[in-house]
Amino acid sequence: MAAAVIVNLYAGAGAARRRWPAVARLLAERLGPLAAHFTEGPGHATLLAHQLAGTGFDPLIAAGGDGTWNEVVNGILSSGSSARLGLLPLAKGGDFARSIGLAGPRHAVETLAAGEVRKVDVVRVRFRGPAGEGRERHFINIASFGLGAEAALRVRGWNRFLPGRARYLAAALPTLAAGRGFDARLWLDDAAPIEFNATTVALANGRYHGGGILIAPQAAIDDGLIDVTLVERVGLAEVAANLRLLYSGDIYSHPKVHHWRAVRVRAEAEPAAPLELDGEPVGTLPLEAEVLPRALRLISPAATAP
Protein backbone atom coordinates (compact mmCIF):
# COMPACT_ATOMS: atom_id res chain seq x y z
CA MET A 1 0.00 0.00 0.00
CA ALA A 2 1.07 3.59 -0.55
CA ALA A 3 2.66 5.59 2.23
CA ALA A 4 1.71 9.16 3.09
CA VAL A 5 3.50 11.82 5.14
CA ILE A 6 1.68 14.21 7.47
CA VAL A 7 3.90 17.23 8.13
CA ASN A 8 3.49 19.82 10.88
CA LEU A 9 5.75 22.73 9.96
CA TYR A 10 4.68 24.56 13.15
CA ALA A 11 6.19 21.92 15.46
CA GLY A 12 9.02 23.00 17.73
CA ALA A 13 7.95 26.68 17.63
CA GLY A 14 8.78 26.73 13.91
CA ALA A 15 11.98 24.64 14.00
CA ALA A 16 10.24 22.01 11.85
CA ARG A 17 9.89 24.46 8.96
CA ARG A 18 13.67 24.90 8.81
CA ARG A 19 14.38 21.19 9.07
CA TRP A 20 11.76 19.82 6.72
CA PRO A 21 13.48 20.48 3.32
CA ALA A 22 16.58 18.47 4.27
CA VAL A 23 14.48 15.70 5.84
CA ALA A 24 12.25 15.57 2.75
CA ARG A 25 15.32 15.01 0.58
CA LEU A 26 16.46 12.17 2.85
CA LEU A 27 13.01 10.59 2.63
CA ALA A 28 12.97 10.78 -1.15
CA GLU A 29 16.45 9.24 -1.39
CA ARG A 30 15.57 6.25 0.79
CA LEU A 31 11.84 5.71 0.16
CA GLY A 32 11.18 7.35 -3.19
CA PRO A 33 8.52 9.98 -3.93
CA LEU A 34 5.91 10.34 -1.19
CA ALA A 35 2.81 12.50 -1.00
CA ALA A 36 3.20 15.11 1.75
CA HIS A 37 0.14 16.53 3.49
CA PHE A 38 0.73 19.70 5.53
CA THR A 39 -1.25 20.55 8.64
CA GLU A 40 -2.98 23.90 8.91
CA GLY A 41 -3.63 24.12 12.65
CA PRO A 42 -4.45 22.20 15.83
CA GLY A 43 -6.42 19.02 15.20
CA HIS A 44 -5.73 18.96 11.46
CA ALA A 45 -3.21 16.10 11.72
CA THR A 46 -5.94 13.96 13.33
CA LEU A 47 -8.34 14.74 10.49
CA LEU A 48 -5.71 14.01 7.84
CA ALA A 49 -4.69 10.74 9.50
CA HIS A 50 -8.32 9.64 9.81
CA GLN A 51 -8.94 10.33 6.12
CA LEU A 52 -5.68 8.83 4.84
CA ALA A 53 -5.77 5.70 6.99
CA GLY A 54 -9.45 5.23 6.21
CA THR A 55 -8.74 5.23 2.46
CA GLY A 56 -5.92 2.68 2.67
CA PHE A 57 -2.70 4.66 3.02
CA ASP A 58 -0.17 2.59 4.98
CA PRO A 59 2.13 3.52 6.60
CA LEU A 60 1.34 7.03 7.77
CA ILE A 61 4.53 8.93 8.52
CA ALA A 62 4.06 11.71 11.08
CA ALA A 63 6.65 14.50 10.76
CA GLY A 64 6.74 16.88 13.72
CA GLY A 65 6.96 16.37 17.47
CA ASP A 66 5.12 14.64 20.29
CA GLY A 67 1.94 16.65 19.74
CA THR A 68 1.86 15.83 16.02
CA TRP A 69 2.38 12.14 16.74
CA ASN A 70 -0.45 12.22 19.27
CA GLU A 71 -2.82 13.70 16.71
CA VAL A 72 -1.89 11.15 14.06
CA VAL A 73 -2.33 8.26 16.50
CA ASN A 74 -5.82 9.53 17.31
CA GLY A 75 -6.64 9.79 13.62
CA ILE A 76 -5.48 6.24 12.88
CA LEU A 77 -7.44 4.80 15.80
CA SER A 78 -10.62 6.71 14.99
CA SER A 79 -10.48 5.43 11.40
CA GLY A 80 -10.60 1.80 12.49
CA SER A 81 -7.56 1.14 10.31
CA SER A 82 -4.55 -1.00 11.21
CA ALA A 83 -2.21 1.35 9.34
CA ARG A 84 1.36 1.43 10.58
CA LEU A 85 2.73 4.61 12.13
CA GLY A 86 6.16 5.96 11.26
CA LEU A 87 7.77 8.85 13.13
CA LEU A 88 9.94 11.69 11.82
CA PRO A 89 11.18 14.01 14.60
CA LEU A 90 11.33 17.64 13.45
CA ALA A 91 10.95 19.35 16.86
CA LYS A 92 13.38 19.63 19.77
CA GLY A 93 11.44 17.87 22.56
CA GLY A 94 11.03 14.41 21.09
CA ASP A 95 10.22 12.61 24.35
CA PHE A 96 8.51 9.62 22.73
CA ALA A 97 11.42 9.33 20.29
CA ARG A 98 13.72 8.98 23.30
CA SER A 99 11.52 6.23 24.72
CA ILE A 100 11.84 4.10 21.58
CA GLY A 101 15.50 4.90 20.86
CA LEU A 102 14.93 7.12 17.82
CA ALA A 103 18.04 9.30 17.59
CA GLY A 104 17.04 11.98 15.07
CA PRO A 105 15.75 12.59 11.52
CA ARG A 106 18.44 10.58 9.72
CA HIS A 107 18.02 7.62 12.06
CA ALA A 108 14.24 7.94 11.68
CA VAL A 109 14.47 7.73 7.89
CA GLU A 110 16.69 4.64 8.12
CA THR A 111 14.18 3.13 10.57
CA LEU A 112 11.35 3.77 8.11
CA ALA A 113 13.36 2.17 5.31
CA ALA A 114 14.03 -0.93 7.43
CA GLY A 115 10.32 -1.24 8.22
CA GLU A 116 10.52 -3.15 11.53
CA VAL A 117 7.06 -3.13 13.12
CA ARG A 118 6.36 -3.30 16.85
CA LYS A 119 2.89 -3.51 18.37
CA VAL A 120 2.70 -0.95 21.19
CA ASP A 121 0.17 0.08 23.80
CA VAL A 122 -2.05 3.13 23.59
CA VAL A 123 -3.88 4.69 26.54
CA ARG A 124 -7.46 5.91 26.16
CA VAL A 125 -8.42 8.84 28.39
CA ARG A 126 -11.80 10.37 29.21
CA PHE A 127 -11.62 13.85 30.73
CA ARG A 128 -13.27 17.26 30.90
CA GLY A 129 -12.71 19.63 27.98
CA PRO A 130 -12.11 23.40 28.23
CA ALA A 131 -15.85 24.14 28.34
CA GLY A 132 -16.55 21.39 30.87
CA GLU A 133 -17.75 18.92 28.24
CA GLY A 134 -16.81 15.24 28.32
CA ARG A 135 -14.04 14.27 25.91
CA GLU A 136 -12.15 11.14 24.91
CA ARG A 137 -8.65 10.96 23.45
CA HIS A 138 -5.62 8.66 23.35
CA PHE A 139 -1.95 9.11 24.19
CA ILE A 140 1.14 7.05 23.38
CA ASN A 141 3.74 8.66 25.63
CA ILE A 142 2.68 10.43 28.82
CA ALA A 143 -0.30 12.25 30.29
CA SER A 144 0.23 14.50 33.28
CA PHE A 145 -1.78 16.81 35.48
CA GLY A 146 -0.67 19.56 37.79
CA LEU A 147 2.77 21.05 37.21
CA GLY A 148 3.41 19.17 33.96
CA ALA A 149 0.23 20.47 32.36
CA GLU A 150 0.77 24.02 33.65
CA ALA A 151 4.25 24.02 32.09
CA ALA A 152 2.84 22.68 28.82
CA LEU A 153 0.38 25.58 28.73
CA ARG A 154 3.10 28.18 29.34
CA VAL A 155 5.69 26.75 26.97
CA ARG A 156 3.63 27.11 23.79
CA GLY A 157 5.34 29.44 21.37
CA TRP A 158 8.31 30.15 23.63
CA ASN A 159 11.70 31.00 22.19
CA ARG A 160 12.58 28.29 19.69
CA PHE A 161 16.29 28.82 20.36
CA LEU A 162 15.93 27.45 23.89
CA PRO A 163 16.43 23.67 24.13
CA GLY A 164 13.29 21.72 24.99
CA ARG A 165 14.61 20.97 28.47
CA ALA A 166 15.33 24.63 29.25
CA ARG A 167 11.90 25.72 27.98
CA TYR A 168 10.13 23.21 30.19
CA LEU A 169 12.09 24.05 33.33
CA ALA A 170 11.57 27.78 32.79
CA ALA A 171 7.84 27.20 32.30
CA ALA A 172 7.67 25.22 35.56
CA LEU A 173 9.33 27.97 37.64
CA PRO A 174 6.23 30.07 38.47
CA THR A 175 4.35 27.07 39.88
CA LEU A 176 7.34 25.81 41.84
CA ALA A 177 8.14 29.28 43.18
CA ALA A 178 4.56 29.67 44.41
CA GLY A 179 4.76 26.28 46.14
CA ARG A 180 1.31 25.40 44.87
CA GLY A 181 -0.06 21.89 45.14
CA PHE A 182 -3.42 20.19 44.76
CA ASP A 183 -5.26 17.40 46.53
CA ALA A 184 -5.08 14.33 44.29
CA ARG A 185 -7.17 11.20 44.64
CA LEU A 186 -6.30 8.14 42.52
CA TRP A 187 -8.05 4.82 41.99
CA LEU A 188 -5.76 2.14 40.50
CA ASP A 189 -7.72 -0.78 39.05
CA ASP A 190 -10.00 -2.00 41.85
CA ALA A 191 -7.89 -0.85 44.81
CA ALA A 192 -8.92 1.65 47.48
CA PRO A 193 -8.27 5.32 46.66
CA ILE A 194 -4.83 6.87 47.18
CA GLU A 195 -4.73 10.47 48.42
CA PHE A 196 -1.83 12.95 48.41
CA ASN A 197 -1.21 16.67 48.25
CA ALA A 198 0.71 16.67 44.98
CA THR A 199 2.74 18.89 42.68
CA THR A 200 2.37 16.69 39.61
CA VAL A 201 1.14 13.26 38.56
CA ALA A 202 2.21 11.45 35.39
CA LEU A 203 0.46 8.52 33.73
CA ALA A 204 3.17 6.93 31.63
CA ASN A 205 3.32 4.62 28.65
CA GLY A 206 6.72 5.98 27.57
CA ARG A 207 9.49 7.03 29.93
CA TYR A 208 10.36 10.68 29.15
CA HIS A 209 8.53 13.99 29.16
CA GLY A 210 9.25 17.71 29.51
CA GLY A 211 12.23 17.66 27.12
CA GLY A 212 14.07 14.70 28.63
CA ILE A 213 12.85 14.30 32.22
CA LEU A 214 12.94 10.58 33.01
CA ILE A 215 9.62 10.61 34.82
CA ALA A 216 8.88 6.86 34.48
CA PRO A 217 12.20 5.00 34.20
CA GLN A 218 10.59 1.56 34.47
CA ALA A 219 7.82 2.09 31.91
CA ALA A 220 7.54 -0.05 28.78
CA ILE A 221 5.34 0.74 25.79
CA ASP A 222 4.20 -2.85 25.28
CA ASP A 223 3.63 -4.23 28.81
CA GLY A 224 -0.10 -3.51 29.02
CA LEU A 225 0.34 -1.23 32.04
CA ILE A 226 0.26 2.46 32.97
CA ASP A 227 3.16 3.55 35.17
CA VAL A 228 1.89 6.18 37.62
CA THR A 229 4.42 8.63 39.07
CA LEU A 230 3.19 11.01 41.77
CA VAL A 231 5.35 13.81 43.15
CA GLU A 232 4.12 15.18 46.46
CA ARG A 233 3.96 18.92 46.97
CA VAL A 234 7.48 20.34 46.62
CA GLY A 235 8.93 23.82 46.22
CA LEU A 236 11.56 25.36 43.98
CA ALA A 237 14.45 24.87 46.41
CA GLU A 238 13.72 21.17 46.86
CA VAL A 239 13.47 20.58 43.11
CA ALA A 240 16.71 22.50 42.48
CA ALA A 241 18.54 20.43 45.10
CA ASN A 242 17.38 17.20 43.46
CA LEU A 243 17.49 18.21 39.80
CA ARG A 244 19.80 15.37 38.78
CA LEU A 245 17.17 12.83 39.89
CA LEU A 246 14.88 14.08 37.12
CA TYR A 247 17.32 12.97 34.42
CA SER A 248 19.32 10.11 35.97
CA GLY A 249 16.60 7.47 36.26
CA ASP A 250 16.74 7.64 40.08
CA ILE A 251 13.58 9.69 40.59
CA TYR A 252 11.94 6.95 42.68
CA SER A 253 14.73 7.17 45.25
CA HIS A 254 13.26 10.45 46.55
CA PRO A 255 10.86 9.96 49.49
CA LYS A 256 8.27 12.34 48.00
CA VAL A 257 8.04 10.45 44.71
CA HIS A 258 5.71 7.45 44.47
CA HIS A 259 5.28 4.80 41.78
CA TRP A 260 2.49 2.34 40.99
CA ARG A 261 1.31 0.33 37.97
CA ALA A 262 -2.24 -0.28 36.79
CA VAL A 263 -4.35 -1.14 33.77
CA ARG A 264 -7.00 1.43 34.66
CA VAL A 265 -6.63 4.73 36.52
CA ARG A 266 -9.24 7.19 37.75
CA ALA A 267 -8.17 10.57 39.10
CA GLU A 268 -9.78 13.59 40.71
CA ALA A 269 -8.18 16.80 41.94
CA GLU A 270 -9.16 19.73 44.11
CA PRO A 271 -8.87 22.33 42.75
CA ALA A 272 -9.48 20.82 39.29
CA ALA A 273 -6.01 20.28 37.83
CA PRO A 274 -5.10 20.99 34.19
CA LEU A 275 -4.34 17.96 31.99
CA GLU A 276 -1.93 17.46 29.10
CA LEU A 277 -1.56 14.47 26.78
CA ASP A 278 1.79 13.99 25.02
CA GLY A 279 2.69 17.60 25.80
CA GLU A 280 -0.56 19.12 24.53
CA PRO A 281 -2.95 20.85 26.98
CA VAL A 282 -6.42 19.31 26.50
CA GLY A 283 -8.58 20.14 29.52
CA THR A 284 -8.93 19.26 33.19
CA LEU A 285 -9.68 16.45 35.58
CA PRO A 286 -11.53 14.28 36.52
CA LEU A 287 -10.17 11.59 34.23
CA GLU A 288 -10.45 7.89 33.51
CA ALA A 289 -7.57 6.15 31.72
CA GLU A 290 -7.28 2.61 30.39
CA VAL A 291 -4.57 0.76 28.47
CA LEU A 292 -5.39 -0.61 25.02
CA PRO A 293 -2.72 -3.33 24.79
CA ARG A 294 -0.69 -3.42 21.58
CA ALA A 295 -3.32 -1.41 19.75
CA LEU A 296 -0.90 0.42 17.43
CA ARG A 297 1.55 -0.87 14.82
CA LEU A 298 4.66 1.30 15.15
CA ILE A 299 7.64 1.29 12.80
CA SER A 300 10.39 1.14 15.41
CA PRO A 301 14.19 0.97 15.53
CA ALA A 302 15.29 -2.65 15.13
CA ALA A 303 17.04 -2.65 18.52
CA THR A 304 13.68 -2.10 20.26
CA ALA A 305 11.57 -4.40 18.14
CA PRO A 306 10.59 -7.72 19.80
Predicted regions: what is each one?
Residues S144, G148, A202-I215, P281:
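Glycine-rich phosphate/pyrophosphate-binding beta-alpha loops
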Residues M1-L60, N70, H107-E110, A305-P306:
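ATP/NTP phosphate-donor binding region
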Residues N159-R167, H209-G211, P217-E238:
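Gly/Ser/Thr-rich active-site loops/lids in small-molecule metabolic enzymes
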Residues R30, T39, L77-T199:
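Catalytic core of DAGKc-family lipid kinases
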Residues L9, A63-G65, L88-L90:
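Glycine-rich beta-strand-to-loop/alpha-helix junction loops that act as flexible
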